[in-house]
Amino acid sequence: MALRRILRIDNPDDKKILTTRCHPVRLPNPALKQLVADMFETMHAASGVGLAAPQIGITQRLAVISIPPVVEERPDGSKVEVAPEQNFVLINPEIIKASDQEDVGLEGCLSLPGWYGEVPRAAWVTVEYTDLNGRRQRIRRATGLLGRALQHEIDHLDGILFTERIRDLSTLKDYSEEMAPTAAE
């Protein structure tokens, strides 16, 4: 596995790649497993939830998503995992159905680190894709973080940046200093 450089929206050369509609992945592809491993490693190192291939300079319709486990605290203070981590490898994904209802939520992007804005998204989506084993899969009516991540990563594959979805640009703010660890941490 290898860390890849994440392209940035504020770099003109990178932005050309980030705003390009990606080509379908041709299968079988022997190099794909290594690329996917690199993408997961890069995404986790950057504390991300999703990463699309164009974010590392590859204009193919490929994305990875990692939804963290859901942990609840019990009355005695102990913690219990109520939903496991979910990892997805999305090859040639497409949204086949989307809710007419919108959900506005705070969203960021590894290609614009530290910046977040309120982005309207469909309240749920159904997505079809091919998995790493070459099988067609379907995620039905994905909501919450998974639904938002699917829409965000598929936008990347279509050359659309999350900043283009923001209706009120005054909600786009740099939180990097607020999120930086203090000397005591």
Curated annotation (Swiss-Prot):
This protein's UniProt keywords: Hydrolase, Iron, Metal-binding, Protein biosynthesis
Transmembrane region(s): none
Gene Ontology terms, MF aspect: metal ion binding; peptide deformylase activity
One GO-annotated biological process of the protein: co-translational protein modification
Highest rank taxon of the organism: Bacteria
SUPFAM superfamilies the UniProt entry points to: Peptide deformylase (SSF56420)
Positions annotated to bind Fe cation: 109, 152, 156
Active site (UniProt): 153
Signal peptide: none
Family per similarity comment: Belongs to the polypeptide deformylase family.
EC number: 3.5.1.88
Protein name: Peptide deformylase
Keyword Cell cycle in record: no
Group of enzyme by EC: hydrolase
HAMAP family: Pep_deformylase
UniProt cofactor note: Binds 1 Fe(2+) ion.
Cofactor(s), by name: Fe(2+)
Keyword check for Membrane: no
Role noted for this protein: Removes the formyl group from the N-terminal Met of newly synthesized proteins. Requires at least a dipeptide for an efficient rate of reaction. N-terminal L-methionine is a prerequisite for activity but the enzyme has broad specificity at other positions.
